[in-house]
Amino acid sequence: MKLTDYVKQVSLEDFGRPFIHHVQWNRRLRSTGGRFFPKDGHLDFNPKVYQELGLDVFRKIVRHELCHYHLYFQGKGYQHKDRDFKELLKAVDGLRFVPSLPNSNSKPLKLYRCQSCQQRYQRKRRIDTKRYRCGLCRGKLLLINQPED
């Protein structure tokens, strides 16, 4: 899919206005589907959203960013808090928030247990069991499950 052509097509079909600036993929975007840059008018999109959530969701994200784009160049309120933005987004059926991506928070938890009092600890990061002990009874910690990395 040619991204620039697709965004121009969505702009004409859903807004009736041309899109004349630059569009690009940005793999560094993590928690957002796209970004609008008022300074030069270009748009960035997250390729993972397109790959993992499909074209229907991606089209709604393109509409969201085009709402920012067209309202900014019309001199209207283009920020999320503005009424103009909310009304236009509703009219074109754009997404307000990106659905969470699968595997976005998939870091497995490590489970430790105190050998004395059986207190359990879940951690994202590894604990040095030679250096750290249980916070309740000062007993030794034991790694129960080692997830595959």
Curated annotation (Swiss-Prot):
Binding of Zn(2+), residues: 64, 68
GO molecular function: zinc ion binding
Superkingdom per UniProt: Bacteria
InterPro entries found in the cross-reference section: SprT-like_domain (IPR006640), SprT_Zn_ribbon (IPR035240), Uncharacterised_SprT-like (IPR023524)
Keyword Repeat: no
Note on cofactor: Binds 1 zinc ion.
UniProt cross-references to SMART domains, sorted A to Z: SprT
Similarity section: Belongs to the SprT family.
Name of the protein in question: Protein SprT-like
Source organism: Streptococcus pneumoniae (strain JJA)
Lineage: Bacteria, Bacillati, Bacillota, Bacilli, Lactobacillales
